[in-house]
A protein has these predicted regions:
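Beta-strand-rich assembly/attachment modules of structural machines
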Residues: 2-271
């Protein structure tokens, strides 16, 4: 199968009953009627005066034992639940993009997520499914996916040696960060126990276009590249520099871009 088409199929591998496939989207297996759910979940309006770390979480924060904390608007929750970037979620009322909520959710004792021994920056596949069910049950989310051809980046091997090393701690939470500064982006990047798939996802957040991993590099790695220009304010230039120094390459291309369209969403039932 064409690698671009394969990438499109991967986006729709985990769909909850609240979202269906649009006519333009390749077919995928239907969602299981026994999708996992949180054992308990509380949803509250954000309290800006609460100094608790978890109450002021921005986006997803995973804790030991699979506990999920989320802080932000409903639209951001949709992004987290479906593993999408902000530019891939459209539609919905204005409040869904501006009104902040705090969510504290716990999986059941027999959930695989209960065995998570560390704090995680990204949800597991099971946690995403549970967040999708939460959106359906508490926010009344109805949505569909559309796929169109558009500009994408292809991440491939470059001409320089790879700057990846074996992970110092293979049990650590995967991270890949290109550092941002108030004056811009300086070209420093650090990865810990991360994969090239995850690196591609992170790069897509900075470039605001999908980055498709075609490096052929498997496994988990650490990497570190030092800053080169602390005054740089051009994100694209800095990202290209980081990628090149890692022994990789970015090229513009055309490929499938999947978008989740919010058809309906309600204010949630609060606790």
């Amino acid at each position: 199968m064409n690698p671009l088409a394969t990438a499109a199929l991967l986006f729709v591998a985990l769909l909850s009953p609240s979202c269906h496939l649009g006519a333009q989207t390749p077919p995928a297996a239907p969602a299981s009627p026994s999708s996992p759910e949180f054992e308990a979940a509380t949803i509250k309006h954000h309290n800006p005066n609460d100094t608790n770390l978890y109450s002021n979480a921005a986006g997803f924060m995973g804790s030991v034992g699979g506990r999920v904390f989320f802080g932000g608007p409903a639209k951001m929750l949709v992004q987290v639940a479906y593993g999408l970037q902000d530019y891939q979620v459209t539609g919905g009322p204005e409040w869904a993009a501006s009104e902040r909520f705090e969510i504290n959710a716990v999986p059941s004792d027999n959930s695989p997520s209960r065995k998570i021994p560390i704090r995680k920056a990204e949800p597991t596949a099971e946690q995403r499914q549970m967040l999708q069910v939460l959106l359906l049950q508490r926010f009344g989310l109805r949505c569909h996916f559309e796929t169109k051809q558009g500009e994408v980046y292809l991440l491939t091997r470059g001409s320089k040696p790879l700057k990846f090393v074996a992970p110092e701690n293979p049990d650590s939470d995967p991270r890949a960060i290109v550092y941002m500064r108030p004056t811009g982006i300086d070209g420093k990047a650090i990865g810990t126990n991360t994969t090239t798939d995850y690196l591609a996802t992170r790069l897509g957040r900075y470039l605001r276009l999908p980055v498709l991993n075609q490096t052929g590099v498997t496994g988990s790695w650490d990497f570190h590249v030092d800053p080169i220009d602390p005054e740089n304010q051009d994100v694209q230039t800095a990202v290209y520099s980081v990628v090149e120094r890692l022994g990789l390459k970015l090229n513009r291309s055309r490929g499938p871009i999947q978008t989740l369209v919010i058809d309906h969403i309600d204010h949630p039932t609060l606790d």
